[in-house]
Amino acid sequence: MKTYFQKPQEVQRKWYIIDARDKIVGKVAEKVACLLRGKHKEVFSPHVDTGDHVIVINASKAIFSGKKETQKLYSAYSGYIGGQKTFSPVQIRQKRPNFIIEHAVRGMIPHNRLGRKIYTKLHVYEGSDHPHAAQKPIPVTLD
């Protein structure tokens, strides 16, 4: 019996929606990364993009476990001397509430060309409104 690899044009992509309200950031990101990569499908292979589109709503209301809300730091470097800045999750939430979920998911998918393509199927929204109602997204609960 030959091994079957699904071609990218044969993939049936679905849309999923996850509500991040009062959910732990890492658990949301883990589920999102799994759906984006397509690891929940029987035809998954690591070198083919078999994943689905994922919508995350209420990203600004996701929580951290433990003391990460006060102790965790995100860093950014401008490339100039003295250009390294650190931000706490509280500061990030004020400026870009979607960044926390996006950053966590980005760390859980491959860091290569395929990962960049997979990442384009992630849609994160601060509130509960999103423009993808026409796609009829399937609600996903975190177990």
UniProtKB/Swiss-Prot annotation:
This protein is one of the early assembly proteins of the 50S ribosomal subunit, although it is not seen to bind rRNA by itself. It is important during the early stages of 50S assembly. Keywords: Ribonucleoprotein, Ribosomal protein. Gene3D superfamilies: Ribosomal protein L13. It holds the Pfam family Ribosomal_L13. Disulfide bonds: none annotated. It comes from Methylacidiphilum infernorum (isolate V4) (Methylokorus infernorum (strain V4)). This is Large ribosomal subunit protein uL13. It comes from the Bacteria.
